[in-house]
Amino acid sequence: MVRSCLSIVLSAGEGTRMKSPLPKVLHKIAGLPLICHVLKQIELAESSQVAVVVGCGGQEVTHVVQSFVKDVMIFEQKERLGTAHAVLSARFALQKGVDDILIVFGDTPLIQQESLHQMRAQLADGADVVFAGFHTQDPTGYGRLLEKNGQLIAIVEEKDASEEEKKISFCNGGILAMRGKHALSLLEKVDNNNMKKEYYLTDIASLASREGLDVRVVEVPFENIVGINNCLELSRADSLWQKRKARDLMLSGVTLLKPETVYFSYDTEIEPGVVIEPNVYFGLGVKVQSGAVIRAFSYLEGAVVGQDAQIGPYARLRPGTELAKSVKVGNFCEVKQAKVGESSKINHLSYIGDAEIGAHTNIGAGTITCNYDGFNKYKTVIGDHAFVGSNTALVSPLVIGDGSYVASGSVITENIPMNSMAFGRARQVIKEGYATKFRARLLEKNLSENKQKK
């Protein structure tokens, strides 16, 4: 029998240590807001219902969450009175009678579905309450997990821990799972008899233990539950995410020559057999097919790179770029909102924007599509087996037919029929011996000007 599950994401914290007007959970790792990383893993853990508790920046957080997850419930914690109080802000959702309750924090972007599945498995096995825990050589600052006979009996915050308890290296990971039938009753028994006068979610451990409930701990890797409180921790978490992504790609058959220098986005898709050189950036929406080579210092976003294509070095692919099989885009080229056909080449110093290029076409060095008049964008269409010479300006809207040649240095403003040759430049004029006369004239002029100054 499939167990129903309500996941509650706590994201009401003010995040003052981020020192940013942006709500903490909307800061990004790999191009995706922190809270969306959490929501993604919750979905993979087969949550049937999702609730998000918002506070500071609630409207912004709500907008992002609702655009990322369908049918999400939003609740506001109007007063910051602790984590248990935050969960009770979602009382309406807690009353729906689900089998499992998962409670996670919106600033833990490295959480993994496997950990959530493990905690739910403990509930299915008979546990009433399950906390996530982790071992660390330096437990300073973390709540300690106190166990007895294999059961969790309490979570003691460091400021309240005895010297003996401070030696415990098993710490609270911040994720909580409960049977739905116990959730409200336990939460309502949490009091605020502490220095901060707040209602702590961790008190549920001792409350449940005293009631004779089955309280367990699932050990998870520390990196899976890392929380974000400032921009330094954000950077460290991003680095952990990047290492994880690079490892997964290399194990799948992708060659990364210097993985620590490559930056991936959360939705980057790279097929086996791809080779990626150092210092490459993958923005949102990039797909790279097998056999492609992405050379050093290239920047890709919103682009599809076809099989056996070669990109870079120093190439930029912008959103809307679609490169077919064996396309070459070389150094200092920028391609935007353009489709490039099989085996076509854009090898040097070119800008191709709002264009469609056929197969087996060569775009010479310094070619520019002039696609913008200050108000509107216009399209350039170049057929199959065409040749565009170096230092050419293509003023769109423009169609260049199959098999046509464009002479180097041309400014092309009119359509070119197929198998034609177009020249769009002034004829070269040679005046033999004129350079000597020209230099003499310039020298005479300079001497005259110098005399006038004196």
From Swiss-Prot:
It comes from Bartonella tribocorum (strain CIP 105476 / IBS 506). It catalyses: alpha-D-glucosamine 1-phosphate + acetyl-CoA = N-acetyl-alpha-D-glucosamine 1-phosphate + CoA + H(+); N-acetyl-alpha-D-glucosamine 1-phosphate + UTP + H(+) = UDP-N-acetyl-alpha-D-glucosamine + diphosphate. The active site is at residue 348. This is Bifunctional protein GlmU. Catalyzes the last two sequential reactions in the de novo biosynthetic pathway for UDP-N-acetylglucosamine (UDP-GlcNAc). The C-terminal domain catalyzes the transfer of acetyl group from acetyl coenzyme A to glucosamine-1-phosphate (GlcN-1-P) to produce N-acetylglucosamine-1-phosphate (GlcNAc-1-P), which is converted into UDP-GlcNAc by the transfer of uridine 5-monophosphate (from uridine 5-triphosphate), a reaction catalyzed by the N-terminal domain. Transmembrane segments: none annotated. The keyword Repeat applies. One of its GO terms (molecular function) is magnesium ion binding. Residues 253-454 are annotated as: N-acetyltransferase. Mg(2+) binds at residues 107, 229. Homotrimer.
